Amino acid sequence: IGLAEAGADIVCVGRSDDSETQEKIKALGREYLNIRMSVSEENAPEEIVKQTVERFGKLDILVNAAGITRRVMAIDIDRKDWQDVLDVNLTALFFMCQAAARQFIKQGGGGKIINIGSMTSYQGGIKVIPYTASKAAVRNITMHMCNEWAAKYNIHVNCIAPGYMVTNMTAPMRSEPSRMAETNTRIPMERWGVPEDLAGAAIFLASDASDYVNGFTIAVDGGFLAKS
């Protein structure tokens, strides 16, 4: 929504109901395209870029926000749960970056890629080992792609690391009042973030204001990492 408020037309990829998001974006006077598929499907990145360019004529910004987790202790995780998380959070994310970068190169003029990492990009967690592994890797490959694409193609690849956020994914944690209270003591701002808190960082990284920022991860965490 924040990018639409800043003037961007939006392409949303996923299988969940997006009617509320679509209404908000159209109310802002921006165009909206929904592509009903999972980013982890084979050939999805190429198809997503193709449909985007067919509709809007070009691609300027990629935000990799898809993510899943499995809440299992490390001693109990099985290969399927491990691989399911890595397929969406890391493998699909990289190939979306690759497909977008190829389109940026074809267009000329560069482009902006924003990957969504996590505070677990910096530290371990509990019961989320494949998620932690994937998000640490996202931070690392963000730097790697910057190294290869910055000067040669003028492609900016940066990352946002959210802290504790009120989302569907964190609902199990938030259902435990004692866990919520304990977590708030570890956040200097003493509250969980909401998705709207990420808008400023996303707009900055998508805009010309960040033209000399590349390969970096911005924490939007209420100060959590500062206190850790």
Language-model region placement:
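Canonical Rossmann dinucleotide-binding motif of NAD(H)/NADP(H)-dependent dehydrogenases/reductases
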Residues: 1-11
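Active-site helix of classical SDR
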Residues: 97, 134
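Short, small/polar-rich loop/turn modules that mediate ligand/substrate recognition or access, typified
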Residues: 151-156, 213-215
